[in-house]
Amino acid sequence: MKTETIDIIIPAHNCADTIGDTIKSLDLQLCKDFKATVVIDGADDKLEAVVEAAADSRPWLRCIKSSENKGAGAARNLGIMASVSEWLMFLDADDLLLPHAIATMQQAIPERPEFVIGKTMRESERGCYEVVGREQLTWLHGRMYNYSFLTAYSITFPNDLRMSEDLAFNMKCAELAKNVPETSWPVHIQRWNGKSLSRRSGASREQARTYIKACLDYAVNCVRAEREPEDLRLLPDALAACYYYLDAVERLFPNDHELYAEMCRDFIKLAQTVELPRLRTLPAWEARLARSLALPSRPYGTAYMPELTFEQRFINATLK
């Protein structure tokens, strides 16, 4: 029998220098009704020593080890299989949860959502923060998932993908979910990690292409399946995600006109497709689509919210 406790699954590989701060952010949670599982992906004596030492003084923390490095998706699948909780969150081993994160997510449990979208504060290379929510529909960061929903539809992370495995997982969730609330405030901090696979320029180029294509495919499949308007609440958010990655392609690869033109053509084709009269019955459809299409270009390294004082204090305190 699964409990209503939230289980936080942390895939870990070559992160002995950062996972201590991640665990420390869990120490500071205002709500203590949670468990955390670190899945060590591949033999790493230094990382194992750090996690095991932390687990000795934290009854809510446990460690699972995989002798072979199979990637973050496979590690998350191990964590899901070992979970005893009805609710799951995924946290990278170099990211942080804000102190109110668990308490905020628990407020959504009585609604029995398929998953909950929590806003994320994304750190730039320059140390500034951008707040991201539903428009990043592809992210795992700051999300909470219902275990029964995942198992009912056999939703797992593709074990054969080393990149964009989170995309495949989230697009399947978005396609099948009907109740997806969003938090009002950020719950998660994505820290800058220049060594991350998705930060390397070659990988970022391919990832941007993969992300946009998957968002477009998801939206097109929704339209072709002639789903009812009430089942298409996330479609404008998929469009917003497309637009976001188009903006990223333009900013990160300003000289790659071919890639940008290809993505723009696909996006415009989809935007024309979803203007079908059938979709106009979706509540506030046109307004939401307009917001998706009118997202401003985001200058790299810009802070977007003046209300970051508390979060900044937390970051400074956590990293001391």
Spans of model-derived segments:
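Conserved nucleotide-sugar donor-binding catalytic segment
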Residues: 130-204
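Catalytic core of nucleotide-sugar-dependent glycosyltransferases
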Residues: 186-193, 200-232, 245, 251-273
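A conserved acidic beta->alpha catalytic loop
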Residues: 40-49, 68, 92
